[in-house]
Amino acid sequence: MIPELGQVFLVAALASALLQFLGGIGSFSRKIENMEAFIERITVFQTFSLLICFGLLTTAFLQNDFSVLYVASNSNTALPFAYKVAAVWGGHEGSLLLWVLILSIWTFLLSKDRALKSSPDLRIQSLSILGLISFGFLLFILYTSNPFERLLPSPFQGRGLNPLLQDPALVIHPPTLYAGYVGLAVPFSLAVSSLLTVNNHQWAMHARSWTILSWVFLTGGIALGSWWAYYELGWGG
């Protein structure tokens, strides 16, 4: 049941990302107040859908549901609790799901930025561009990297998590690094939006705080990754 529900919410997130993008296009021909409210609701729904997806995948790991191919490939019954949670993003499919979830959270936070509400055109176009980025990632996940793919008949035991990844750093490093990488999509969307709107001189002012916050996450993630590689892979000699 978990894989099927995950598929439903992935498709729902894909549809909402597309509507978020199309809403920005529609703002050129409709009342901007109506489109603002519409896009904001769609952003909330997309974030909610992806949180449900992530929660379902985490539940599959904690329940040792080896009928899910991704779980069987990255976990087993002997894996400690913390590593079962971290294994959710320990492989390709799960890390992409984490990536797009963080992107949706950044998008949601941007939609609640009070300072940006003084520039409705810039706000709508930025959210629209972020919707297009989310749509691309979700389409890629659904067609090439689906974490909810079934494995039937299901094995009694999974293959387990890569021993190199069984480290406390796995719990912190990928989310921190991804928050930095993905967060830079916000200033990117503001910069592109400035090319599509009339009052484009304000984008740098709005982007500054988002850029600094993303830079802090990215710096922390790279520093932690360097430390992890130093002792885990023996790069320090």
Protein language model annotation of sequence segments:
Residues 1-237:
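Polytopic transmembrane helical bundles with strong interfacial aromatic enrichment
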